[in-house]
């Protein structure tokens, strides 16, 4: 429940101007200190908070963020390599060298024996002591480059290796082909032999069939001849009696024997 305000305050409040511009509310005469009492302090605090909140929302809408803390954390800068590089024919090289355990132990033992305090001095001593070997290496490299380039040497090595590989593969392929040919020849020989045996067996079977057929035909023919001869003997006139019948029978039997002998001779010739 708000306390009553005097008539002068009402008259001043009537003349006060409330301007609504976007989200901002401007209070002119209501915020003057000599018209307010201590009882109106909570109301003024709430209006001040409302104004601050509206101002913050207006700034956010317009793209202004007054929060001092950054929204996204910035990435840390990458630490640059402060060591200078040495440029060689194969590109830049780092001055720092990583040694294996055995080589590092030998290197530092040599450094302690020489009494040097820096590894570069030890390396300088090693290079000066190996000047002759370095010169010989440079001379050998120069002679090789004049005679044939390293690429040519590599190509020769690769060609020799490829020839060896091809020869080896050719030898293997020839051996495999020879084995296959031998197997095929043996298989073909066995097949030819089996076919020859089959043909021989077929010829023997046909001969047997022909012999059996001819024998059957001869037997049928002989039986037919016996039947014909029996009918002829039934019509013989009994003039001379027994002697004439015997003559006819003997002649018929002689003819049958000669015929059968000729047929047997033909069968033997076929076999």
Swiss-Prot record:
Gene Ontology CC annotations of this record: nucleus
Compartments where located: Nucleus
Domain R: 192-209
Superkingdom, natural source: Eukaryota
Record keyword DNA-binding present: yes
Chain spans, region Disordered: 64-85
Ranges where the TCP domain occurs: 79-137
Matches recorded under Pfam families: TCP (PF03634)
Any one GO molecular function term: sequence-specific DNA binding
Gene Ontology biological process terms from the UniProt entry: regulation of secondary shoot formation
Known role: Involved in the dorsovental asymmetry of flowers. Retards growth rate and reduces organ number in the dorsal region of flowers.
Protein name according to UniProt: Transcription factor CYCLOIDEA
Gene name tied to this protein: CYC
């Amino acid at each position: 429940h708000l306390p009553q305000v005097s008539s002068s305050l009402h008259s001043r409040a009537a003349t006060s101007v409330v301007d609504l511009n976007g989200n901002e509310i401007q209070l002119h005469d209501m915020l003057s200190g000599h018209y307010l009492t201590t009882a109106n302090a909570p109301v003024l605090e709430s209006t001040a908070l409302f104004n601050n909140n509206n101002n913050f929302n207006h700034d956010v809408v317009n793209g202004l963020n007054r929060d001092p803390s950054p929204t996204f954390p910035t990435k840390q800068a990458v630490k640059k390599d402060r060591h200078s590089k040495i440029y060689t024919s194969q590109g830049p090289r780092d001055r720092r060298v990583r040694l294996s355990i055995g080589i590092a132990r030998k290197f530092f033992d040599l450094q302690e024996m020489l009494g040097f305090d820096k590894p570069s001095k030890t390396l300088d001593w090693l290079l000066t002591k190996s000047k002759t070997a370095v010169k010989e290496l440079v001379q050998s490299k120069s002679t090789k480059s004049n005679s044939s380039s390293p690429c040519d040497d590599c190509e020769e090595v690769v060609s020799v290796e490829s020839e060896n590989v091809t020869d080896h593969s050719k030898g293997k392929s020839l051996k495999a082909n020879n084995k296959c040919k031998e197997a095929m020849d043996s298989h073909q020989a066995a097949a030819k032999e089996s076919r020859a045996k089959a043909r021989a067996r077929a010829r023997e079977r046909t001969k047997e069939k022909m012999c059996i057929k001819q024998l059957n035909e001869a037997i049928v023919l002989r039986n037919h001849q016996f039947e014909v001869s029996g009918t002829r003997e039934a019509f013989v006139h009994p003039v001379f009696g027994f002697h004439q019948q015997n003559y006819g029978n003997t002649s018929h039997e002689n003819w049958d024997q000669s015929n059968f002998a000729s047929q047997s001779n033909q069968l033997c010739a076929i076999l």
